[in-house]
């Protein structure tokens, strides 16, 4: 049994926090920069977020194959983590500062450089994010430890992503808004430093485990070509179901937490963005704490599938209440608006439904990531191949293809109601915003959660099943280390009842 030390479980997920710093910046603010600072067209700015997310998805399988083929003195995953972060640093400086040096009279060059630097950033981002999903396979294969990876992964995300979300409105208010160059002059260097520190911690976390003895069951790893991806995906039904579940969760998150949507909800509709955004964000995080503890306990006792299904269902039920409250909202009527002083019944109900719903959802938002490791171990059990890079990037391929729609959907929805500049905290209410917020903030996440529940219905990698898979993989690896061929080991041990007692988990 390959078990991780506590510090490794805590530090390696910081890799996800490091990339989420850039992810949330891109998701929420790059369109503001392109439109407000560079003067690029609104639809171009929002559409480019989708186009580059698609490019990110396309590069995933290629980089996944590179990871699986890589074996250096510095390990398999660490080179991609470090190089990816360096590329993002360079590209961010060029993207957010270099493009401003181009004269407004040469707007065509601004468009070209924006696209090129953005594409370079995507390559670096893919290098590093691919390691979060694939690297965990060598960190631990203990079904009781992998749920802990979820909670530490979420904490790491909060450190990176939460820091940006917390500081952004404060800096925006002091530096002229999200459309100002001054805002990016402070936010980008801060993001670079935070991401670099988190990357360093993640490298320390995986240092001892990034070695060949923790890679799969065979001493030699088969090189899989990119063209074989489709066959692998077709054969691995569990990964297919997880893709649907993960993509649905990511789409819900990318749209419902989009800064434009929140500006319309708390600013234009409730007329108090500065007084509501941070408190409501904190409410969601506070409510998520008990759910984190519950998800870990449920995952350790019944498996990660049971935890994901249970708490996604709770989020779905609670958001029915949020939906009803937003439908009942009345402009200018204090009794039907959010207010933290004085507090009304509408606010109390909203905090309860939103807090419990968001808390339940957020506690499971990153759960598909360690579940990818389960699918990777299942692939090793099924075919004998240790291909965590391919498995992780196959998952993120669909994940990114779907979530890439987020900014475009928001941008298109805003354009449909006649708004030509992305709303910020000071934007006044206009006709159509009410319906747009209801759809983007409530209905889209609810549909995504229903997709998740349907996909998980046929998912077979339960807690007990993963114990069987790990036991079979362990006895095969032991036999191969003693001289047996991979083919013979695959044929000799197929089921739990064939496994010697010493390889079985308690």
What is each of the regions a protein language model found here?
Residues 1-505:
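Membrane-embedded alpha-helical bundles of multi-pass transporters/translocases
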């Amino acid at each position: 049994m390959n078990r991780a030390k506590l510090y490794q479980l805590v530090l390696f997920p910081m890799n996800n926090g490091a990339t989420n710093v850039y992810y949330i910046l891109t998701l929420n603010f790059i369109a503001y920069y392109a439109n407000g600072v560079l003067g690029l067209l609104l639809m171009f700015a929002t559409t480019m977020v989708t186009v580059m997310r698609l490019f990110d998805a396309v590069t995933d399988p290629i980089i996944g194959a590179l990871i699986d083929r890589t074996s250096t003195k510095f390990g398999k995953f660490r080179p991609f983590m470090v190089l990816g972060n360096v590329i993002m640093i360079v590209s961010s400086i060029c993207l957010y500062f270099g493009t401003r040096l181009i004269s407004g009279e040469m707007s065509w060059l601004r468009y070209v450089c924006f696209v090129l630097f953005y594409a370079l950033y995507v390559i670096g981002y893919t290098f590093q994010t691919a390691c979060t999903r694939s690297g965990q396979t060598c960190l631990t294969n203990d079904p009781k430890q992998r749920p802990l990876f979820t909670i530490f992964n979420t904490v790491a995300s909060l450190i990176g992503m939460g820091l940006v979300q917390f500081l952004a409105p404060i800096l925006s208010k002091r530096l002229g808004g999200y459309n100002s160059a001054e805002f990016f002059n402070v936010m980008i260097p801060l993001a670079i430093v935070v991401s670099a520190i988190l990357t360093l911690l993640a490298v320390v976390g995986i240092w001892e485990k990034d070695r060949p003895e923790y890679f799969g069951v065979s001493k030699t790893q088969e090189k899989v070509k990119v063209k074989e991806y489709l066959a692998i995906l077709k054969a691995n039904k569990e990964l297919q179901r997880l893709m649907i579940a993960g993509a649905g969760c990511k789409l819900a998150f990318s749209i419902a937490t989009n800064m434009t949507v929140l500006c319309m909800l708390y600013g234009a509709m409730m007329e108090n963005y500065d007084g509501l955004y941070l408190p409501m964000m904190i409410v969601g995080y506070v409510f998520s704490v008990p759910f984190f503890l519950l998800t870990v306990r449920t995952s350790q006792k019944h498996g990660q599938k049971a935890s994901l299904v249970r708490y996604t269902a709770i989020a779905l039920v609670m958001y029915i209440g949020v939906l009803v409250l937003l439908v009942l909202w009345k402009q200018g009527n204090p009794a039907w608006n959010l207010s933290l002083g004085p507090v009304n019944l509408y606010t109390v109900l909203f905090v309860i439904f939103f807090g419990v719903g968001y808390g339940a959802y957020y506690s499971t938002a990153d759960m598909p990531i360690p579940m990818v490791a389960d699918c990777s171990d299942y692939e090793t059990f099924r075919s004998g191949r240790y291909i965590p890079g391919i498995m992780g990037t196959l998952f993120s391929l669909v994940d990114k293809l779907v979530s890439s729609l987020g900014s475009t959907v928001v941008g298109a929805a805003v354009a449909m109601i006649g708004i030509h500049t992305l709303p910020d905290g000071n934007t006044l209410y206009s006709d159509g915003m009410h319906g747009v917020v209801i759809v983007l903030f409530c209905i889209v996440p609810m549909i995504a959660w229903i997709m998740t529940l349907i996909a998980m219905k046929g998912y077979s990698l339960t807690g007990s099943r993963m114990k069987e898979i790990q036991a079979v993989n362990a006895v095969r690896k032991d036999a191969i280390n003693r001289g047996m061929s991979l083919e013979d080991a695959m044929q000799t041990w197929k089921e739990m009842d064939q496994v010697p007692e010493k390889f079985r988990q308690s």
